[in-house]
Regions:
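Conserved alpha/beta catalytic core and glycan-binding cleft of carbohydrate-active enzymes
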Residues: 288-290, 304-460, 489-544, 548-557, ...
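Short glycine-biased active-site loop of nucleotidyltransferases that positions the nucleotide triphosphate
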Residues: 58, 187-191, 235-242, 347-348, ...
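Carbohydrate-interacting/catalytic domains
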Residues: 1-134, 157-168, 172, 425-427, ...
Length: 611
């Protein structure tokens, strides 16, 4: 058979569809197989179709080994590679589209042309956008531990969709973000140590079933975001590590090993860049995902994630080129960076020397918020700034507020269990914390179980504690989250123009002794006033000073009895009085229950008729 050459872009790092060129694909008379292994002395193909007896492959000048075989879809295969040291090692296909269930390590034949027929989401795809002026409220989840069957086994992708989608719709989330689904050998890595970058993990079914999962989400109005690991990969000998007997995908020095015991990708090699470009693109292209969240970007930007070792310029160029290429091919895709550093211009366009991401996780907001709500009440005066500081830098990037899986494990406790106070006070504080999150500028992300007020830390081997819904406070809390998310959807001022400084204004940000915060969100429908009392004492007729006279109509309170609070019903509308301080000549007096928040719509005062 005459082989076509790989596109030149592959070697320069500009290829975004490698899954169409390498790996295994049906061809006339069987299947074609290709693997890039330039340092190998020999490569053989073995699988179900040849009794696992190595069949010879031929090498081209670029180091790509190829052959054809009479095989059938669903059969398993591997490449047997002879390295420069004279040893043979079996490897899974780096570009395999499907894989054997662990502990097996073989690749599985799959025809990618079958995927497009699974989708009926044309209307959704035509309406995709980056949600800059739309609500974006993300439910982060691990597919294997959200819910399990009565016998403890996993739901497959289609079964998971049937269980999950009604829950997402009920709680008015806009997107689901899946912890990495690329194939991985170790359950305890949560998907962050990959061996198969192009294959949805076989734990939960087939590529076709995953495509149907995405399609079902789209038909229900739910976007799908994929967590992606572009910095490091599993060190397993059957994967990418020393694939051709040399340091091919990884660095060959001390920077080749990550803090997790994995191998760091060599961003200076064009073929590695093309591999990663394509590994991200496949989720957007073949599986219709709406965006990519890129993990551990700080570990790429700086050598070993250490700013003192300097910026990794190869990684910077890789991220810029990848983001630019993805945006060109998928203009509506949402690209998000998990980056805990102060690296500048993460969300600036590449043409302005930025990295080209659409959003960046606000790790500072997360730490400050959790630290504040864990602080004893009598020490909060000194911690008051933790809830105001985020707005001093918020407009430097396009930030996304996240309370992710990383904050629910390894002894950190879950969100509600971190919070200071008695059992009842923890619930009041949790309602207040999420109110603060939903009324603060920035897109939102919460990890599964947070809506249940989950006290047990996340364990990938167990489903969530769904029995919590039998307890009144937990049942009320998940209904509270659904209502709060609904409020976010319903009020444009909570998401439109949120990256415009003119759409936010502090009303009370120096009330340290009282623990009171108040701020305006401005948008269509008029301004909204958010007020928070972070102390376990009530304030009656607390004064808030405004620049315009208005009537304040309560839209939402965290303290309603239906949520587990003490207030029977929202307060009646209150008009400002013509007195004030500091150039704010109108005073609004509000009653603030302990550990509570409220959102008011500010309406113009009726005009007095002319006499």
């Amino acid at each position: 058979m005459t082989w076509t050459m790989l596109p030149q872009e592959y070697h320069t790092g500009a290829c975004f569809d490698l899954y169409r060129h390498l790996g295994a694909h049906p061809c006339k008379g069987g299947w074609s197989f290709r693997i890039w292994a330039p340092g190998a002395l020999d490569v053989q193909l073995e699988g179900d179709f040849n009794g696992w007896q190595g069949a010879p492959m031929s090498r081209d000048n670029a180091g790509v080994w190829s052959c054809t075989a009479k095989a059938k879809e669903g059969q398993l295969y591997k490449f047997r590679v002879l390295g420069p040291d004279g040893s043979w090692v079996e490897h899974s296909d780096p570009c395999a589209l499907a894989a054997e269930l662990r502990p097996g390590t073989a690749s599985r034949l799959f025809d990618l042309s079958r995927l497009e027929a699974q989708f009926t989401d044309g209307v959704w795809m035509a309406g995709q956008d980056k949600h800059y002026d739309r609500p974006m409220n993300i439910y982060e989840m691990h597919a294997g531990s959200w819910k399990r069957k009565p016998d403890g086994s996993w739901y497959d992708y289609e079964e998971l969709a049937q269980e999950l989608i009604p829950w997402l719709v009920e709680h008015q989330y806009t997107h689901v973000e899946l912890l990495p689904l690329a194939e991985h050998p170790f359950d305890g890595s949560w998907g962050y140590q990959n061996t198969g970058y192009f294959a949805p993990t076989s734990r939960y079914g087939t590529p076709v079933q995953f495509a149907r999962f995405v399609n079902a989400c789209h038909l229900a109005g739910i976007g799908v975001l994929m967590d992606f690991v572009p910095v490091h990969f599993a060190k397993n000998a059957d994967g990418l590590a020393r694939l051709d007997g040399t340091f091919l995908y990884e660095y060959d020095s001390d920077v080749g090993q990550s803090e997790w015991g994995t191998c760091n990708f060599n961003f200076y090699r064009g073929e590695v860049r093309s591999f990663l470009n394509s590994a991200a693109a496949i989720w957007l292209d073949l599986y219709h995902c709406d965006g990519i969240r890129m993990d551990a970007i700080s570990r790429a930007l700086y050598w070993l994630g250490d700013p003192s070792r300097g910026v990794n310029q190869g990684a910077v160029q890789f991220l810029q080129n990848m983001n630019q290429g993805l945006h060109q091919r998928f203009p509506s895709a949402i690209l998000t960076a998990e980056d805990s550093t102060n690296f500048l211009k993460v969300t600036a366009p590449v043409e302005y020397d930025g990295l080209g991401f659409d959003y960046k996780w606000d790790m500072g907001w997360m730490h400050d918020t959790l630290d504040f709500f864990a602080t004893p009440f009598d020490q909060r005066r000194d911690a008051y700034h933790k809830l105001t500081f985020s707005m001093s830098y918020f407009y430097n990037e396009l930030y996304l507020l996240s309370l992710s899986h990383d904050e629910m494990v390894h002894g950190k406790k879950t969100v509600i269990d971190k919070l200071w106070g008695t059992y009842e006070e923890k619930f009041a504080q949790a309602r207040l914390l999420y109110f603060y999150m939903l009324t603060h500028p920035g897109k939102k992300l919460n990890f599964m179980g947070s809506e249940l007020a989950h006290f047990r830390e996340w364990d990938e081997e167990r489903e969530l504690d769904w029995m919590l819904l039998r307890y009144p406070l937990h049942d009320a809390f998940h209904k509270y989250i659904a209502a709060l998310n609904g409020l976010y959807h319903a009020e444009p001022a909570l998401y439109e123009g949120e990256y415009n400084a003119a759409c936010f204004e502090w009303v009370a940000c120096q009330s340290r002794d009282e623990g009171i915060y108040a701020y305006l969100r401005k948008g269509r429908g008029g301004p909204l006033l958010a007020v928070m009392n972070t102390q376990p004492k009530a304030y009656l007729k607390y004064p808030l000073y405004l620049t315009e006279g208005c009537t304040a109509r309560m839209l939402f309170s965290t303290d309603l009895q239906q949520w587990g609070g003490t207030t029977r019903a929202p307060s009646q509308p209150q008009a400002t009085l013509p007195s004030g301080v500091f150039g704010r000549n109108h005073t609004l007096y509000v009653d603030l229950p302990p550990l509570s928040g409220a959102l008011y719509r500010l309406e113009e005062l009726p005009r007095k008729p002319r006499g």
